[in-house]
Amino acid sequence: MGKFTFTQTEIPGVVVIEPQVFGDDRGYFMETYQKDQFTEAGIDKEFVQDNQSRSTRGVLRGLHFQKNHTQGKLVRVTRGEVYDVAVDCRPNSATFGKWVGVTLSEENKKMFYIPEGFAHGFLVLSDVAEFCYKCTDVYDPTSEGGIPYDDPTVNVQWPDCGCEHKTSAKDKLHEPFAAQKFEYFEKW
């Protein structure tokens, strides 16, 4: 029924996806995933877990990855607005250490595909945001890893959210990007 527009970012494999939205005075309808179209666009993945979070303005989640149960993610916002970021942690990649970001909102309905081998995070720009994502592997607390959101090597340019960033105590403990080897991402 619906068609998707797939736009490759400057980092190969990281894709912004725009669904076709059918709207009228009653509201709207859109497909948020259609395996055949995603496969045709090069995203031939099996998603095994769906997650949802709710956060308030200034919450900065990330930058997260899993070392062993490496996850690809298809993310979108169902309420509010976030700035979403993917950081290439694949040591054999030409874009190793580079990042790309996109604004996702309930208004623009964009989705963001982040492949395995990337760190991922987002900053909430609205009063409240609800964030949904599909993962290619299950959550494994023993595989948790991350990069500081303000790492000087990666140097993500987070937009102004109108308040101080709110991060978890755990996210403040991540080793700097330059101190990590990322050997678990060599196959990606």
For each of these PLM feature ranges, what is it?
Residues V85, F112, H120-L125, Y133:
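Short beta-strand His + acidic residue motifs that chelate non-heme Fe in jelly-roll/DSBH
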